[in-house]
Amino acid sequence: MIAMEIDLTLIGMEKGRQYETIITTSDADNVRNAAPIGVICSGKDKILNRIFKGSHTLENIISQREFVVNITHDPELFALSTLGNLPEDHFNEDSSLKCADAYFKCEVISLKEAVKQSDPIKKKGEAIVIKSKVTELVINRPAKAFNRSFGCVIETLANYSRFDLVDETQKEYYLDRFRECSRIVNKVGYKNDKLAMAEVKKELMKKWYEP
């Protein structure tokens, strides 16, 4: 475990990009909670989160004004923290995850109600945008925050490689998946991810399909 200077680029986080993380919190009775939540890097020592009301994570953040962001690529950890709370033996004393490649501690700067027009949930005040300052960064092993756009590119390429081998119904499914993957890549992806998707789109259009 190495405590580093506070610079989120050390774990592959770029300003303006969104990353998939597991946020851990605790309540006043030190009952811990873990939940997969996207984090937007807004500077080398600042992040933004947008969390819907009704979650234990948001309740704990509002009451304690602090939380831990864990960096991991472990699919089991993401699954367990989505489907139910992690067992206590997964946590360190400071509420970080024992298996995390890296983690950073945050203190809340501000809380603001916000709802995007594109949200399926339209009720005002359903979500809270949390602006936070990173107070400590710990790297346990070489780590890079997970950005889901790369997985979307790989899925798109796998589907494209089968495109000429399937019937029209399956082709339409692949096109729908391309559109959804493009939406995600355009929202959270890097320049190279977007270029890759643009190349696939050009090839699909050559086949007279409109992705």
Residue ranges of predicted features:
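Basic, polyanion-binding surface patches
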Residues: 1-211
